[in-house]
């Protein structure tokens, strides 16, 4: 992000955040909000003035009546602060504005919460007074970062030959992954428009219309359950390209995201964008959006315990993780982790402390010497480590250990650099329902992997669950940034998939005839 300041308009000649000792002697006019006022004797006061660029100290007459969050215009002379009064926590901390004349532009009631970054305020209160919350430095930085990201993405997409096309906001309802928000039609009572969950059909029409390479910073709306990282409205970089495959789109997006990262975080330049299959991600990290900034990978132990005398392990999927130096965790903490694992769906959690000669564990007496030695060897355990094992169905084991590794070791988002990762080869179907039909992992319009078309034609449940799709996700430090897929363009394959999920020919023609 750039530190350059735009030209000042009208009532101001400078921005608060740009003043430095090099401006000493310059007559300036500033506009902003009163952040704080401090009395300094009977006839002198210091006022911190804030605008979107930062805060600067102004020296004012003690008789001037200004209060927190009043909007004012200040004229005065920039000077270097006296030695010993500098404020190193401010970018402007070596300068101040003296001999100030203050013009009150707007008075204000006391703010509903403090605006300094040191004070945590309940989010409900912040949202109720969002216009005040937006004045905080963090929110201003977020808005500028968002604008910088959008500009970088636009520039990169245009350099790669894509054309920005705005698509309609009012459309007919189409099958998507969530419920629609609807808008009643004034001209057609009883009928409704839907707000777009994505511009999918419109961008496909752009391809039919010869646009060839389309993109849009698109506003999307989905009526789904709210979470910390999921809201009704969101913005996405949406794109489509004709005569392109998965590798082409991944390359385009890698270029665009790299350009965006260079503008937002030039000191944290990302390295490679490695690939990992969905299966490997689930087996090694227990998640399809793994945080690869740290280890604690899941290790397969099922074969070791296939014929175990310990009933909880025998014949189950068994995996473990090694926590370096974790043997020092208290019994209370281990009990907390066990309870957490049960809440996540496990029957229990086996822990083992690695000692010089043996493994200290409540279940050690139920395991053979060969099994204990095998655990130690396969997990590459060292003295002082903690080993955590879960035995259950494979889906449960992966899920629980995947969450445990995050619970134990996930670093803050700001640490460890930018670790981008492409997840590829998602399954086309995630399960078989009670009627024996496959359940699409995403939607029934994703192109199967070309090497798995024979499995699709077989129709057996085992084969269908082995079909990979041409779907892909981009992950950053354990968070899904976005996803995409190659759509089915051959009517025969589309018919096959729709038939497999239980849609008859008449319904196909009625709902999806334009695709067939």
What are the roles of these predicted feature ranges?
Residues 1-516:
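Class II aminoacyl-tRNA synthetase catalytic cores and aaRS-like
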């Amino acid at each position: 992000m750039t530190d350059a300041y735009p030209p000042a308009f009208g009532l101001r000649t400078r921005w608060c955040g740009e003043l430095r000792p090099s401006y000493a002697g310059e007559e300036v006019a500033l506009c902003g909000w009163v952040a704080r006022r401090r009395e300094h004797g009977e006839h002198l006061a210091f006022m911190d003035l804030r605008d979107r660029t930062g805060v600067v100290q102004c020296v004012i007459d003690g008789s001037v009546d200004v209060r927190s969050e009043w909007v004012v215009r200040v004229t005065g002379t920039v000077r270097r602060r006296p030695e010993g009064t500098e404020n190193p926590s401010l970018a402007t901390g070596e300068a101040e504005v003296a001999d100030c004349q203050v013009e009150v532009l707007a008075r204000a009631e006391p703010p509903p919460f403090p605006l300094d970054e040191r004070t945590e305020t309940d989010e409900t209160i912040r949202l109720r007074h969002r216009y005040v919350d937006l004045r905080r430095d963090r929110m201003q930085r977020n808005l500028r970062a968002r604008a910088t990201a959008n500009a970088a993405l636009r520039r990169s997409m245009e350099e790669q030959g894509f054309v920005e096309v705005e698509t309609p906001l009012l459309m007919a309802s189409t099958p998507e992954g969530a419920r629609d928000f609807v808008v009643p039609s004034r001209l057609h009572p009883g009928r409704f428009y839907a707000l777009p969950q994505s511009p999918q059909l419109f961008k496909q029409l752009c391809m039919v219309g010869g646009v060839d390479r389309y993109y849009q910073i698109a506003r999307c709306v989905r009526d789904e359950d709210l979470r910390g990282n999921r809201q009704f409205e969101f913005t996405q970089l949406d794109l489509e390209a004709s005569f392109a495959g998965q590798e082409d789109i991944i390359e385009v997006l890698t270029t665009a995201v790299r350009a965006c990262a260079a503008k937002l975080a030039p000191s944290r330049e990302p390295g490679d964008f490695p690939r990992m299959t969905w299966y490997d991600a689930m087996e090694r990290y227990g998640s399809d959006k793994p945080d690869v900034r740290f280890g604690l990978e899941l290790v397969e132990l099922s074969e070791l315990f296939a014929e175990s005398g310990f009933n909880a392990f025998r014949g189950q999927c068994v995996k473990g993780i090694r926590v370096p130096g974790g043997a020092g965790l208290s019994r209370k903490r281990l009990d907390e982790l066990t309870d957490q694992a049960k809440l996540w769906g496990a029957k229990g959690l086996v822990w083992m402390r690695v000692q010089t000669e043996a493994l200290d564990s409540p279940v050690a007496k139920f395991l053979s010497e060969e099994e204990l030695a095998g655990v130690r060897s396969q997990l590459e355990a060292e003295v002082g480590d903690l080993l955590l094992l879960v035995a259950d169905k494979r889906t449960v084991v992966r899920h629980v250990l995947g969450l445990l590794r995050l619970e134990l070791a996930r670093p803050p988002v700001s640490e460890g650099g930018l670790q981008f990762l492409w997840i590829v080869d998602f399954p086309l179907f995630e399960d078989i329902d009670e009627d024996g039909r496959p359940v699409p992992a995403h939607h029934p319009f994703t192109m199967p992997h070309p090497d798995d078309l024979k499995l699709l034609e077989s129709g057996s449940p085992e084969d269908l669950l082995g079909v990979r799709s041409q779907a892909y996700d981009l992950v950053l430090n354990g968070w899904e940034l976005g996803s995409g897929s190659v759509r089915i363009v051959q009517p025969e394959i589309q018919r096959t998939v729709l038939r497999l999920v239980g849609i008859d020919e008449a319904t196909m023609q009625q709902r999806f005839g334009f695709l067939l």
